[in-house]
Amino acid sequence: MFQSLIAIDYGKARIGISSGQMITKTATPIGTVEAYDGVPNWIELDKIIKCWNPSDIIIGLPLDTQNFETDITKSAKDFAKEVQQRYQRKVHLINEAYSTREARWRLEEVKSKKVSHIKVDALAACVILETWMSEN
């Protein structure tokens, strides 16, 4: 049984993070963790994982519109392996196609005054988590 969940929108400069639960099938943006060339600030990510203590971690897999791997797909897969080893949680990969576009659209719909990268990345993680929850 799933308890709390964390979703991650992997990126080379920032990693968006959201939390959610299967009971309500809702996701909430937590924020972002800075990354340097795809390597996250592990200390910050450690704090988030410790605080939320998720049963599972869902990571967006960057594929193109035809579900082919992109230049960043291998980095995301390597990151997912590191997350699984580091936190000893089940890690699920899900196609994240259009998650950033959907996040931007949602922010524009609520007329967010500042569509920042931080908001977009965290909200993209919500989109990833909501998609995964609807399929599981």
From Swiss-Prot:
CDD domains linked to this entry: YqgF (cd16964)
InterPro entries the record matches: RNaseH-like_sf (IPR012337), YqgF (IPR005227), YqgF/RNaseH-like_dom (IPR006641), YqgF/RNaseH-like_dom_sf (IPR037027)
Coiled coil: none
Main location: cytoplasm
Ribosomal protein keyword on record: no
GO cellular-component term (any): cytosol
GO terms of biological process kind: rRNA 5'-end processing
E.C. numbers: 3.1.-.-
Keyword S-adenosyl-L-methionine applies: no
Family statement: Belongs to the YqgF nuclease family.
NCBIfam families documented for this protein: RNAse_H_YqgF (TIGR00250)
Protein name: Putative pre-16S rRNA nuclease
Organism (species): Francisella tularensis subsp. tularensis (strain SCHU S4 / Schu 4)
